[in-house]
Structures are given as C-alpha cells and as structure tokens.
Amino acid sequence: EDPQVYYPEAILTVNLGASNALALVHVGGGATNEIYEVFAFIGCDAIYTTVDSNGTLEPAGFIVGASTQYAFGLACTPEGFVQRESWFVGSGDDWENEPWDITDDEYEYDPNRGHFALLSSKTIQLTWSEIQDQDISLCHFDCPGAGAGC
C-alpha cells in the first residue's frame, strides 16, 4: 500500500506515489507565529522537521515564511540519497536560493537538476494559515527505486 499520513490537524497531505508522501501539520503557535511539523517519506527514508510562519527553521532543510515567502523541497542526489533543499521566492527564475518569478502560474521544472518543488505561485504568496484552502501541486523526480512525474 502507498504510505499515507493521517493526522487530525494536518492541513496539507500529499501522496507522491508508490513510496513518497508529504504532510504539513499545524501543531500550535500564537497570533504572530504559527508552528508546523513537516513529515516527508521518500522510499524508506522518513524526514521530519519543525517550521514556523516567521521563517524560523529547525533543523536545516525546510523553510516557510508568511511575510517573506519561501518554498521548500527535497532533492535526490546522484548517489541516491535524499537531500533537503529550500529556495527563496522573489523575482527571477534561477534554482537553489536564487529568487524565482512568482508571476508565473507554475515554476519551470528542470529534470536534469533532479528537483521537485511547490508549483503553485498563488499558494506560496499566501500565508500558511490560508494554505489549506489552496490546491498544491508537487513535481518529483527519478530516484533509484522510485518513479518520476508531476
């Protein structure tokens, strides 16, 4: 069976296929800083981290922001290891911590770089308290033993 993440407070759960899943879980916070837990399952590897809506990050890997907008993603190295990555969302269209153009409906996907990322500019421009009302698109890539597609 495809691994699924079921959690009563999950505001975002994405099934990425045979052995990949992602969930964003709201776990608390106050009026100015909401706290989320991120669970990612890639093959047999489980990745967990905590993020908040002010962009604070622990441990390194995922970044989200409410006023300054970030996207988060995972990448597969040529050796088959899962690598966490993040990108700032601004203007331009380059990869890896370079600003992106959020006026496009979808960000370009570079299969030669082996990335998947959030592809909804409307979602990224919203605060995370509103994200549960939006459609999320994820693009993922060839990993040893896993399929590829968007």
Regions found by a protein language model. Name each.
Residues 1-19:
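Short N-terminal edge-element motif at the start of the domain
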Residues 27-35:
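His-enriched metal-coordination microenvironments in redox/metal-binding proteins
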Residues 1, 47-56, 117-126:
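Beta-propeller fold detector
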Residues 59-150:
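Acidic, small-residue rich beta-repeat scaffolds with periodic aromatic anchors
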Residues 13-27, 73-85:
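Acidic/hydrophobic-patterned starts of short beta strands in beta-sheet-rich repeat architectures
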Residues 35-69:
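Short helix-loop boundary/capping segments
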Residues 21, 36-37, 105:
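Residue-level detector of short, conserved catalytic/binding motifs and their immediate flanks
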Residues 25, 40-41, 109:
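Hydrophobic side chains in beta-strands
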